[in-house]
């Protein structure tokens, strides 16, 4: 259902309800200090798909796609900024672990500056499993990690279809993800 604090009319092709709300009620359901006057409430989709489900739905990234994987990125503003940056550099798809922040959180949507709605984003329950499947399909998957023996991005050729994993803000990447990557 959608809530509109303006004219109280739904577009003619809208099948859902439109409600006019008192300012106090509107302020209670909005996370914004100065909302724009329109709020959409929608049912959330399945946030955590198993890799087998993604494969059966044909959503494994084609080899030509540039992919960024995120593990346990918890701050919604960081998720939004990563989505925005990924769009700016031509990333085709983002794959998020199930415990990443909600991409539809108001802070994530705002930080993405609208690019969220043009990006292909998948959320998976078994990120190491996805990484293994990507590697088995011939793709290289690089882990962005602070390690004295790590190679710097730019010190080696990046090819079409290569993938990069970015980890949690405080803890980086898990051992399971690091061991699954190249």
Per-region residue spans from a language model:
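Active-site/ligand-binding-proximal alpha/beta "capping" segment
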Residues: 142-182
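Gly/Ser/Thr-rich helix-start
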Residues: 38, 81, 115, 168-173
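Short, conserved catalytic or adaptor-binding loops enriched in Gly and charged residues
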Residues: 10-13, 111-115, 177-178
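Short connector loops at helix/strand junctions that flank enzyme active sites
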Residues: 33-35, 63-65, 159-160
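RNA substrate-binding interface of SAM-dependent RNA methyltransferases
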Residues: 1, 5, 19, 24, ...
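Short, hinge-like loop/turn segments at secondary-structure boundaries
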Residues: 38, 111-115, 159-162
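Glycine/small-residue-rich loop that forms an oxyanion/phosphate-binding "nest" at active or ligand-binding sites
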Residues: 10-43
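Structured helix-beta-strand junction loops
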Residues: 14-16, 137-138, 180
